Amino acid sequence: MSEAPAVMSAEQLLREAVIRIARSDAEPLLLHALGRDRAWLFAHGRDPVPAEQAQRFGALVERRHQGEPVAYLTGSRGFWTLDLAVSTATLIPRADTETLVELALERLELTAGVRVVDLGTGSGAIALAIASERPQAQLIATDASADALAIARHNAHAHGLHNVECRLGHWLQPLAGERFDLIASNPPYIAAADPHLQQGDLRYEPASALASGSDGLDDIRLIVADTPAHLLAGGWLLLEHGWDQGEAVAALLIARGFAAVATHQDLEQRDRVTLGQWPHAAG
């Protein structure tokens, strides 16, 4: 008879896993395999883990070792104060984008009827974060991917955010004839030939949400050109971009007629969001 595999505790499983992957990756994968939270791990880390769950964890570790993003393996990612479902149809929300949310909130009055758009919403991260902090605002989240929009709708429902409407379409197409107080977007902004697209987590994320032409600015140009027709006088456009694109994006906004154009840095002190205010009553 062959010997049964040794029963291991959660702590032992983690110690073995960190030989292959980072502990910061191993821990959420273990909790996902166990269906537990961090408080349980702290209290029960020495408890034996059933073989089936240990095997599931081992398979997740192997997939992470091969490069799959933790967020896709667990199906979720924390953003702002929200736990969001994600899939391979959506970009993985990142902490850098919280800079855009903070800047948007600073520019939204605490009054009923404020209208906000999140272009290319993906998982809904930007729209839902704003909606959670400004329940009196009306949010519209657009995306060209029906699969991504289904994830955004799921997340809105899961968090009880009923002030968010999801619309299918490319950038501003679903907004014909409407004007808003603020439009925000984290569009694709990586150059199509950038080697980083073939490295790390980016290999697994949807290319349509990452790359945008030879200089990474094709989609930003489209948004800047078309947004004024959808802004109220004094309305704001906020765009996330790459660390080295601040000057170029600011120049596009200024050339289009935006005022109060400024570039803001993320938590790593890198240029990350450029914004401008539309001063006119018509686009």
Swiss-Prot record:
Substrate binds at residues 186-189. It comes from the Bacteria. One of its GO terms (molecular function) is nucleic acid binding. GO terms for biological process: methylation; translational termination. It catalyses: L-glutaminyl-[peptide chain release factor] + S-adenosyl-L-methionine = N(5)-methyl-L-glutaminyl-[peptide chain release factor] + S-adenosyl-L-homocysteine + H(+). Transmembrane segments: none annotated. Its EC number is 2.1.1.297. It is an enzyme of class 2 (transferase). Keywords: Methyltransferase, S-adenosyl-L-methionine, Transferase. S-adenosyl-L-methionine binds at residues 120-124, 143, 171, 186. Belongs to the protein N5-glutamine methyltransferase family. PrmC subfamily. Methylates the class 1 translation termination release factors RF1/PrfA and RF2/PrfB on the glutamine residue of the universally conserved GGQ motif. NCBIfam families: hemK_fam (TIGR00536), RF_mod_PrmC (TIGR03534). This is Release factor glutamine methyltransferase. The lineage of its organism: Bacteria, Pseudomonadati, Pseudomonadota, Gammaproteobacteria, Lysobacterales. The gene is prmC.
